[in-house]
A protein has these predicted regions:
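TRAFAC-class small GTPase G-domain
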Residues: 1-199, 203-207
Length: 207
């Protein structure tokens, strides 16, 4: 979904505008109506904004609020989730640092469709090793699937292999209230840093 405001600032003053290093590039994907844009603008403005379906993409710079991600800048590309737009996802995931895949935890009828798109994204050669955070959205609604159920329905273990080797984590969240969003961003940031450290170590060993 889209709010019709790209790259706009929050008006938070001089300190907020100061750079804090190179931003982490994040692609936010998921089926249409999963709540991607609501999550993006809740992270950006810390308030709920009514949105309309995204035709194309939204791009915003957001800042981590807790944990190791606190103060870290993220450049988040929220890409439309309609079926006709999904072939474009690969253009946004190329060279990205991490992926947020938003899932509607209540929409059981489309979980198989979400699984198919998640699997396709995770197994794309361009995305090999890229950390993925599955944002289990709409946890405030009755009938929302719990994390363990979603992991099973989405085939997370099938995608990632044995426990402990996973670059995919699931974070329960509610985009409207903001619950779980910054926790998820922090988790993804730690996965990104872990991957970068491992790559650096491997380069040293190869010398």
């Amino acid at each position: 979904m889209g709010a019709g405001m790209g790259r706009s600032g929050t008006g938070g003053g001089i300190l907020e505008s100061l750079p804090t290093g190179t931003p982490q590039h994040i692609a936010m994907l998921g089926l249409d109506s999963a709540g991607k844009t609501t999550a993006l603008y809740r992270l950006k403005f810390d308030q709920y904004l009514n949105t309309v379906p995204t035709i194309g993409f939204n791009c915003e710079r957001v800042r981590g609020g807790i944990g190791k991600a606190k103060g870290v800048n993220f450049l988040v590309w929220d890409v439309g989730g309609q079926e006709k737009l999904r072939p474009l996802w690969k253009s946004y995931t190329r060279c990205t640092d991490g992926i947020i895949f938003v899932v509607d935890s209540c929409d059981t009828e489309r979980l198989e469709e979400a699984k198919m798109e998640l699997t396709r994204t995770a197994r794309s050669p361009d995305n090999a090793g890229v950390p993925i955070l599955i944002l289990a959205n709409k946890q405030d609604l009755p009938g929302a699937k719990e994390v363990c159920e979603l992991e099973k329905h989405l085939g997370v273990l099938e995608i990632t292999g044995p426990p402990g080797t996973s670059c995919i984590k699931v974070q329960p969240a509610c985009a409207i209230t903001g619950e779980g969003l910054h926790e998820g961003l922090d988790t993804l940031y730690q996965l990104i840093q872990k991957r970068k450290k491992l790559a650096k170590l491997n380069r040293k060993r190869a010398r």
